[in-house]
Design a protein with these regions (language model features):
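Juxtamembrane/disordered regions of integral membrane proteins
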Residues: 2-484
Length: 484
């Protein structure tokens, strides 16, 4: 028995060592291929491209592959690592040689490096993340959250169809096809309609296959939908469609700004897809998982909904109060953002607090089961604020008041002051909602069903949620600034 116990640690060490070797070699191989491809596209030295791809792939395989437990998780971790590479390495090199340059000049240099961002995401982060995620999924036998093909096909396929029909009908009324921006201009109208629906269906179907284990409720589905939609903007309008159309790739800021409106369209579609997927997935869970008496809630759904609306309204009001000084200082409150309609300061503040209360109620419904700690509540609040900046002042508000929307980069840049107000509002709303919820839960933790519910809210170790927050927030904020 003693000899067996001495052997077991050695076997474990050898398995960990072999896993690191396998992940490192796979990351190295895919990274070299991706680095050489991005070197050809950007016309960079093959040696530099080789070293960059090899180094990124090797480091990702050694330090991040253990978190890539599925293709979807690997994809998100790979994209966030590629974004971090673009932000840190070139920025560090620039700062070392900046010699006191003005911030405006550094912003211009960052705009010049936008093609590198596209290359890092598509040639390094995406393929390396997916490859190591597939390897991790084959190696991982997750008994607690097994992958269900039926759930992925039903929820992903039908949500892609439903959201594609809704989004397609909405865009069709304005004769606008953002999901196929970059496609040939001489295409017929029926061809554009078909292609847009096909792209929407593809995004929806792959969403369920990639992120089934990661999404929980409406809030996380919308967050993952936002991040996945941003990736598809890089894949589709910036790369794939121009290649199919026979035009030259233009990854510069000027070229990408021509299809910036498509980015907003992709984000809105991602949000619609997230809501549709969460609805269908919840129906599946209710039918096949929560029908088990051991997993039933201790409270009725109506009571939980009413309580979430109450907490959300109070949290939203507090968020509106705390974000109002920034809104007043930037001149956002006296105006209906971007519409040129002037209001008195008192009227603008009252309208801001009223809207903040209603938006807080939506946070209570959408994100009530997402945050398990104070830090995660603030992160989801940031995502919530970013979502409503794209959905509110960029889309719904002008659409309701004027019947038109302006998604040009110049128009969106003028709304940047309200973006930071939305982020502060979202973070405060998320934190306040968590405090109210935790205060209530602390009085009912003796109920074993409450304890089980809290345990289900905890995300497993290595969850890609932090990577999603970094990727979605980073690009959701950076792209409007770069294109302004």
């Amino acid at each position: 028995m003693a000899s067996i116990q001495r052997v077991l640690p050695i076997v474990r060490q050898e398995s960990i060592f072999s896993r690191l070797i396998g992940d490192g070699v796979l990351g190295l191989a895919v990274g070299i291929c991706g680095g050489l491809i991005q070197g050809v596209i950007l016309d960079v030295s093959p040696v530099d491209s080789f070293l960059l791809g090899a180094g990124f792939g090797l480091l990702f395989g050694l330090f991040f592959a253990r978190r890539a437990l599925s293709a979807g998780a690997g994809l998100i971790w790979g994209l966030s690592a590629a974004l971090l590479l673009w932000m840190v390495v070139p920025t560090l090199a620039t700062s070392l040689h900046a010699d006191g340059r003005e911030p405006g000049n550094m912003l211009d240099e960052t705009r010049k490096r936008f093609p590198e961002l596209v290359a890092y995401l598509l040639c390094l982060g995406m393929p390396i993340g997916i490859a190591l995620g597939i390897r991790g999924g084959l190696r991982q036998r997750n008994i607690e959250t097994p992958f269900r093909w039926g759930r992925a096909i039903v929820a992903g396929g039908f949500s892609g169809t439903a959201s594609g029909l809704v989004f397609g009908y909405w865009m069709l009324k304005g004769d606008f096809f953002p999901l196929i921006a970059g496609w040939r201009d001489d295409s017929s109208h029926p061809e554009k309609v078909f292609l847009q629906f096909a792209v929407a269906l593809t995004i929806g179907a792959t969403f369920g296959l990639l992120f089934q284990r990661d999404v929980r409720g409406y809030g996380s589905c919308m967050g993952w939908g936002l991040g996945y939609a941003v990736l598809w903007w890089f894949v589709g309008p910036l790369t794939f469609f121009p290649l199919i159309a026979g035009t030259e790739l233009n990854w510069s800021v000027d070229g990408a700004s021509q299809v910036f409106g498509a980015l907003v369209g992709y984000i809105l579609y991602g949000l619609i897809l997230g809501v549709a997927y969460a609805t269908l997935d919840r129906i599946w869970v209710r039918l096949f998982i929560q029908s088990d008496p051991l997993n039933r809630e201790s409270e009725g759904p109506g009571f939980r909904l009413f309580r979430s609306l109450q907490w959300g309204a109070l949290a939203g009001l507090v968020g509106g109060l705390i974000s109002s000084p920034l809104m007043l200082a930037t001149g956002v409150l006296p105006h209906l953002v971007g519409l040129g309609i002037h209001l008195s300061t008192q009227t603008g503040l009252l309208a801001h607090l009223l809207v903040s209360t209603f938006l807080g109620m939506s946070y209570g419904v959408l994100f009530r089961d997402e945050a398990s700690t104070l830090a995660t509540s603030g992160a989801w609040g940031w995502v919530f604020g970013l979502i409503w900046w794209y959905a509110g002042p960029l889309t719904l508000l002008p659409l309701l008041l004027t019947g038109e929307i302006d998604w040009r980069a110049s128009a969106v840049f003028s709304l940047l002051p309200s973006l930071f107000g939305h982020l502060i509002y979202g973070a405060v709303t998320g934190l306040m909602f968590y405090v109210l919820e935790r205060r209530y839960m602390s009085r009912h933790m003796l109920d074993p069903r409450m304890t089980a519910r809290e345990a289900r809210r905890l995300r497993p170790e290595g969850t890609p949620a932090p990577a999603l927050w970094f990727f979605a927030m980073g690009l959701g904020m950076a792209i409007p600034i770069l294109f302004g």
